[in-house]
Amino acid sequence: MIIGVVSDTHLREGRVKLPAKLMEAFREVDHILHLGDWMTLEVYDQLSKLAPVDGIAGNNDGYEIIERFGEKKILSFEGVRIGLVHGHEPYSSRITTPQKARKAFEGEPVSCILFGHSHQPYLQMDDGVLMFNPGSPTDKRREKLYSFGLLEIRGGQVLPRHVFYEDKG
């Protein structure tokens, strides 16, 4: 099973055009997970034409997105429990976004935590839990490249990778 992972699209209503590189890659996935800051459900509409979509809301999402997706969840794919959280809470500059994401699932059995918020691609193991941030496909901030993620789940293993590109067109 291949899961497309995206976060921080930050697209405004009526101006939704997801990058061609992302759309092309997500045509081949079995499921898509969005980790917040959709900004409009038009992003959901575009992605859901490619594969089933789930996700969570981020700190820039409105009531409609929060109501539809919630702000934290655990999903299971082929027996692998995956935690989804945006990564902005608790509001504190004393801990990093990965630390906030990890803290959100403290005491909960998950194999992998997917998070966004920082727009920074991230891939690390933390005490046996895979921590993965896909970066942003549309708003790279200080990063050199735009990015999204792909997770392959095979035999109970999660095999993550980032997809990087220069042009968001």
State where each predicted segment sits.
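Short active-site segment of divalent metal-dependent hydrolases/proteases
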Residues: L11, T40, E89, Q120, ...
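Short, flexible, glycine/charge-rich loop motifs used to bind or transfer phosphoryl groups or to couple energy/partner
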Residues: A20-E24, V43-Q46, K72-K73, A101-A104, ...
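Active-site-proximal segments of metal-dependent phosphoesterases and phosphodiesterases across multiple
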Residues: E13, D61-P109, D139-R142
